[in-house]
Amino acid sequence: MGQFLSSLFLGQPYQNMGFVVGALMIAASGIIPLLILPRERSSKDDGDGKSGAEAAKEALENLLPPKLKGAHDFYKACGGRLLMMASYAMISQYTLYIFENYVGLTVQEAAKAMGTLSAVTFVVSLIGLAVSGPLSDKIKARKTPIAIACVLFIIGTLCPVMFRSVNGVLLYAAFAGLGYGVYIAVDGALNVDVIPEEAQHNRTGGKYIGFGNLANTCGQVLAPATTAMLVAVTGSYYTAFIVSALCALAGVSLILWIKSVK
């Protein structure tokens, strides 16, 4: 949806207003939930009997990564998540520049193509989300849908390599967008399933979920930097497509290595 809205401003005299609209939407995403959600009860009077120093020490310990012992599958899932998200973001965050510098479109032509690409991505992602989650629950397996998502990622990233055209990039959006929807629908459940039982008993599962989200964010942060470096070194997006496919392959390999989840 964000890509579609930004394409409406691209190449227009009011192009800079896109930044203003984006900033307002970011602000609204924080303010609206704050106004709607019930007020959270204060914990200052819980009376757990801990001194200030003990509470501070516990808070600092909670910021440390989970222990590796008993959490091997969890770290495999985190590594797989980082690589899968990096694979998708390496290309999806650069589609505008791919249209302009790889395919050779003008700014106006790229803006029109971005609108089409965003619509394609939106539709196929919803289809992937709607099908993958219920299917995963029905077959009681997490790794199978993720393997399918990986195949879709790889097919998508190779389409612009084989077809250096608008249609090639749109094929990327169709395959990779569908793969993204399939993956996102199952990824969260997988990362909950691999949380060690000890953490569930100690009620520290939130720490594991937070660390898993960090892996997700790191993948999206490292991806554009990696693409920029590859393009700067090679002078083309060709290598970025190949590396993106390899990241997806490495990510799904880690996930398939998980032993505690089917």
Predicted regions and their residues:
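A membrane-interface helix-boundary motif in multi-pass transporters
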Residues: 8-24, 227-248
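Helix-to-loop junctions at the C-terminal end of transmembrane segments
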Residues: 10, 128-141
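Multi-pass alpha-helical transporter architecture, strongest
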Residues: 28-37, 222, 242-262
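Juxtamembrane intracellular "pre-TM" segments in multi-pass secondary transporters
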Residues: 40-79
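Short amphipathic helix-loop junctions that connect adjacent transmembrane helices
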Residues: 93-112
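C-terminal ends and interior cores of transmembrane alpha-helices
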Residues: 151-164
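Intracellular juxtamembrane helix-capping segments at the cytosolic ends
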Residues: 182-200
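A late C-terminal transmembrane helix in Major Facilitator Superfamily
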Residues: 201-233
